[in-house]
Amino acid sequence: MFDAKLGYDDVSIVPEVVTYMESRKQGNPYDENGMLPIYASPMDTVVCEENIEDFLKNKINVVIPRNIDFCRRIELGKKYDVFFAVSMSEAEDICKFYEGEYGSTCMRTDESYKICIDLANGHMDKLLTICRKLKSFENAHITLMTGNIANPETYVHYEDAGVDYVRCIIGSGSACLTASCTGVFYPPFSLIKETYEIKKRIGGRCKIIADGGIKDFRHIQRALIYADYVMIGGLFNKAIESAGKTTYGKSYWNVNGNKIFRPLKTLFTYGREIPREKFDEAYRDFKAGKLAIWKQYRGMSTKEAQKNIDANAVLKTAEGKTFYQKVEYNLSGWVENEVSFLRSAMSYTDSRNLRDFKESKWVINMSFNYNK
């Protein structure tokens, strides 16, 4: 029998027959640490040193990207108690440190660390071996995140390896070309649903992160039916605080007293870069309709991102792309909306917390014709 797999826009959440919550405010959209079930993706056009506090004060979890110096990543991870991303080779070096092969490093055996092994292909046995090693050292106190995976059954291997968080979904991010270039893909809603079912069946403790393809608020709520967390890149890039290169220009030309909106390409040609200290001023002008502001956004496998991580690296064929997105909001405004929308979804499903929201009823959409 044909087994159809579903994306986020193939399903809708169904309300309970009768609900007993009197207000959406009775729903608690935060996890046990008081944070939203959302991570900012470790991308160099999303997270930077200067905006970590912006994310955290808005209750968004952060993973520090690999373009920042290794020792500085560790320092920031400790300062803010957040995950920092490492490459496969850096993860191997960390293993050697705990094995006593390195006499001097930025790490200490009496410290705890939150490490994200940031890899596109989380199906490699070599990665699983590294994960087992990192979780087996008696002198290591490591909370470990890794991935990405696009086969539900791989979850069992990461659970057995002692991994704490696994990132699911390959190829569906707006700056990712893996699916279109390689043909590798697993529709995201079905992937996290089937991964969750395996987790539930085996009593797994490794948390599921839906990472990629989140294009709107509705996708977040649908992902959270089965995922513990959602990881977001493109939506956060469209916030004024994001790390992407920021350009601006008047959004129109004045021709004989008439406003003629400028073609997109002229903004990139003639627009000037906005320094971070001018973001607030630029955002006020944007809200007043005086400026158009654009953010560079790129996948971390693009050659530009590879060079930003290591200027001397041998560049690989890119499975990502670079483009510009129009700034649409600031972080606090976006978060205010998401909290309200998530609470509303929880009230429809009579869910007072995120645990109650798990396994909310849903149906397959035969047509997608409501307002996006």
Residue ranges and their predicted role:
Residues 1-17, 21, 182-210, 214-372:
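Alpha/beta catalytic cores of nucleotide-metabolism and tRNA/nucleoside-modifying enzymes
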Residues 1-207, 234-239:
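Active-site entrance/lid segments in N-terminal catalytic domains of soluble metabolic enzymes
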